Amino acid sequence: MFYKVTKRIFDFICALIGIIGTSPLWIVGIIGILISDWGPVFYTARRIGKNNKPFKMYKFRSMRVVKAATEASLRPDEDRIFPFGHFIRKVKIDELPQLLNILNGTMSIIGPRPVAQDQFDMFRYGKWNEAAKVPVGLSGPAALYDFIYGDQIIDEKEYMEKVYPTRRELEYTYVRKAGIFYDLKMIVYLSLIHISEPTRRVV
């Protein structure tokens, strides 16, 4: 109980400080998106969170708005990303709105990464139920592994076969090791990664 309360207070304070501290990046992101492709600033993705409950995860929008089933809407997602969208994805600005999820309690700073419905359907039984006992996180040990190995693989099928299973195992491991000091250690590790190579994909 002490850990849960401490973690929630820590998450709320960090998210609030994070939003204030990164406010210039929010302004740049909002203006850049509106200039690139007029429409909603935020993109909401349905993800599975704690106790296998769905929630809306926020991101800055990086793809063009599709209003009808035109030829453009049938293109692969990669073709719909506008140039500024590529930039905010590369430097991770698109992830900043997830600080709002941390404020409202649907996410934490450190924890298993939230998964999409199709991924949840693949891993919903067994160990996944263990990972679902804690709040999903902005980052965590699986993100660190993905940074080291996942970024080297472009093919999605190869990624799902070689990287994703180990990544899921690390999510389960987090549940067993979860604690305030372990969370702080992960924050230090991930911060060092962002500082040393800020333009690489971390999560």
What are these regions (language model features)?
Residues M1-V65, R176-S196, R200-R201:
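A hydrophobic, helix-centered structural microdomain
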Residues A15, Y43, F82-H86, D118, ...:
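Positions in alpha-helical segments
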Residues Y43-R80, P141-E169:
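Short, glycine-rich, amphipathic interfacial segments at transmembrane boundaries or analogous
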Residues E78, K90-D94, A178:
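Soluble non-cytosolic domains of exported or imported proteins
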Residues F84-V91, Y172-R176:
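Short, well-ordered beta-strand elements within core beta-sheets of diverse protein domains
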Residues H86-S108:
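Short, conserved beta-strand/loop elements in beta-sheet-dominated catalytic cores
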